[in-house]
């Protein structure tokens, strides 16, 4: 499959992936039901800006929640954050069933690549695959998030090279399992043409500003097409 064909396929999937859930979200009371979205991951979805400051209401789960409600005003929707700062996907996988799937989510997002550089590609893939398969087995839709950028971009060092490769790993997993992809890494790339541009989107060594969180929320929200 060519790159163009992949992009077309991804675009079509973005339109249809959540169809059954979006149809339910369009229903009015008393025919509607509660829809649960779980955001699982590390410090970024947890809302950390300049550590130890946590800016919950400027982080992408809350921004996403507002975007969803603007598009689906009749839906009762919970966006539940199960993210913990400092975690890798190994940590997140160990508590995935207990902390994330216990909410019986209709949709779960997974965001760990920034920290997964500490564990390497093989262990990261095993942990991500385990979480994906557990979610899909229970009928939960999955949207994977590629990493947001960090200050390794300025250095263009091994840390940056690893981040690029982890982003590609997440894309590969989304393609392998035919699930959703929120390409945060690509969204940052579209808005940053020179090093000084990153200051608008980076609040800390490796945490986005609100503007950076908006980019992530928009990537996820592309699956929530208003009816």
Regions found by a protein language model. Give the residues of each.
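Catalytic His-Asp segment of secreted/periplasmic serine-dependent ester chemistry enzymes
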Residues: 12, 22, 148-227
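Cell-envelope and extracellular/periplasmic
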Residues: 44, 52, 81-87, 109-117, ...
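Alpha-helix N-cap and loop-to-helix initiation/capping positions
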Residues: 52-59, 122-123, 127, 158-165, ...
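Alpha-helical structural signal in soluble globular domains
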Residues: 63-71, 99, 130, 134, ...
